[in-house]
């Protein structure tokens, strides 16, 4: 899985969520917190994550514009947690 580029994971997640009712996916996973993934009408993938920052669970946001491949990530999301969460979402939505 490490060889899949992040942009490809995001495209695949976007496509998987597009096929769901209301283009929305919610999940609570005790180890990883809460996930809320949805697509909007402007071809943007939105991901809300619960991240452990300084031993406190906080909500952080990721947006990916499908038209221009622009990725916006809240600054303080630790890279290891970000990649971990994206991989986990990818597995749940795209590899089942």
Kindly label every feature range from the protein language model:
Residues 6-9, 13-17, 67-96:
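Ampiphathic alpha-helical segments that act as solvent-exposed interaction surfaces
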Residues 20:
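Acidic-histidine catalytic/liganding microenvironments
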Residues 23-84:
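Acidic, low-complexity, intrinsically disordered interaction modules
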């Amino acid at each position: 899985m490490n060889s899949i580029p992040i942009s490809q994971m995001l495209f695949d997640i976007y496509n998987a969520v597009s096929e769901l009712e209301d283009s929305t996916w919610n999940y609570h996973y005790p180890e990883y917190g809460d996930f809320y993934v949805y697509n909007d009408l402007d071809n943007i993938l939105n991901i809300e994550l619960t991240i452990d920052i300084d031993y406190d669970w906080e909500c952080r946001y990721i947006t990916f514009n499908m038209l221009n491949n622009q990725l916006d990530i809240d600054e303080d999301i630790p890279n290891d947690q970000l990649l971990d969460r994206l991989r986990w979402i990818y597995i749940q939505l795209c590899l089942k």
